[in-house]
Regions:
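N-terminal capping/lid subdomain adjacent to the active-site entrance of alpha/beta enzymes
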Residues: 1-212, 217-219, 226, 233, ...
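Short, solvent-exposed coil/turn elements at secondary-structure transition points
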Residues: 9-12, 161, 269, 323, ...
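Active-site donor-binding loop signature of nucleotide-sugar glycosyltransferases
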Residues: 48, 242, 350
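Catalytic core of soluble alpha/beta enzymes
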Residues: 184, 189-330, 334-336, 355-366
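A glycine- and small-aliphatic-rich helix-loop capping segment at beta-alpha/alpha-beta transitions
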Residues: 339
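Short helix/strand-capping turn motifs
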Residues: 342-349
């Protein structure tokens, strides 16, 4: 029988994080500690973290709902996926807790499946640790070349919104430490100043040397969006995230049809938690890419669904963290390694664990432009 304890923590940003929805100075998270009477002393930890004004489940009654869902999981012995589709951050926190519990259980029981032998799930079950149906994919989440410290995941450097001078300084810092893919959050200052910043980069670096991604966070007006996309396209931009605000499907579909540079949907996916609605969105808008954040887009279960549907339609994808602490970031990195591995080609939007003054220690480190697990 499983038991889940809930704790809270507020993390503090080293410097204010500017987004299109304001500036974050703190980050509030709930942590789930999962134990089982089948294996005393073994535990798994997951993080449930919403973003105010962005997450579809960032509601005043969140703490009460979280407690109720955890009690449900304790009684059922599994994650009731269909019942909690509207709560992606809770789904992801539970998945992370179970995945880290199973990983700890395998180490405690010294389970190392041989090739062609029984799966880790089967061996755990044989040793008295039940693996709920539909959750077998969580058992080996941390078992990959990345998880063993053998491979790194290429990530993009993120340049937050700020003044022209601040963004330029942050950009130069990212390039100096070795990033070859840089993402600029735009929309905070005059568009032509941001364009000038991009021009500065291209005056020095070709697209082969530095891949540029931009994130408009829905900041373009529909009537101006196409001309702004055309202006950006002159500088060999890899992609632009969410050029206009979400919930404008006909206009976004038109932009995706006529755009001179690839469009990636991000906020557009938030709150679209039912499979049939996901199909309708992808079939209507037909984006070039979708960007998946487990805390916002349905946890691992929901993101797997998005990736499957996107692949069927020839739509690309990558995975991004969403200002989680190292608990969430660690799980997202392992998930990206599983989904796109063993050799992850496309740079992922994973945080570096260096955003907060009081982050939770985790064996992750950046070497150049790659994220590694330290063994």
């Amino acid at each position: 029988m499983y038991k889940i304890d809930i704790s809270e923590r507020t993390l503090h940003f080293k410097q204010p994080a500017g987004t299109s929805r304001g500036v974050y100075t703190t980050r509030h998270s709930y942590y789930l500690t999962l134990t089982s009477d089948e294996l005393p002393g073994v535990e798994g930890v997951g993080e449930c973290a919403t973003l105010p004004d962005l997450s579809c489940d960032a509601k005043p009654e969140y703490a009460v709902t979280l407690r109720q869902v955890c009690q449900m999981v304790e009684q059922m012995g599994r994650i009731p996926y269909d019942m909690i589709r509207a709560y992606p951050s809770i789904t992801f926190g539970l998945e992370t807790a179970f995945a880290s519990f199973f990983d700890a259980a395998k180490k405690f029981l010294e389970i190392v499946p041989a090739e062609g032998a029984s799966s880790s799930s089967e061996i755990l079950t044989q040793k008295g640790v039940s693996v709920p149906a539909g959750m077998e994919n969580l058992v080996d989440l941390f078992d990959s070349p990345f998880g063993k410290g053998e491979e790194g995941i290429t990530i993009n450097g993120l340049v937050w919104m700020g003044t022209y001078e601040e963004m330029l300084a942050r950009l130069e810092e990212k390039l100096q430490v070795g990033f070859h893919c840089v993402k600029l959050k735009i929309g905070a200052i005059d568009f032509f100043k941001e364009l000038d910043l991009i021009k500065r980069i291209r005056d020095v670096y070709t697209q082969e040397q530095v891949e540029l991604r931009v994130d408009a966070n829905g900041g373009f007006l529909p009537e101006n969006a196409m001309s702004q996309l055309e202006a950006l396209a002159k500088y060999d931009i890899h992609s632009i995230e969410q050029p206009i605000k979400q919930h404008q499907w006909p206009k976004m579909a038109q932009l995706c049809r006529e755009t001179p540079l690839p469009i990636a949907l991000d906020e557009e996916l938030i709150g679209v938690n039912v499979r049939s609605m996901k199909e309708a969105l992808l079939d209507t808008i037909r984006p070039q890419y979708i960007i998946l954040k487990p805390s916002l887009h349905g946890g691992i279960y929901g993101c797997n669904e998005w990736i499957q549907l996107a692949n069927q339609r020839g739509i690309g994808s990558w995975i991004t963290s969403a200002l989680e602490s190292n608990i969430g970031l660690n799980a997202i990195a392992h998930y990206a390694a599983k989904v796109y591995g063993p050799d992850v080609k496309m740079p992922q939007g994973l945080g570096t664990g260096q955003l907060f003054t009081d982050n939770i220690p985790m064996p992750l480190e950046i070497r150049g432009d790659k994220l590694f697990v330290v063994k």
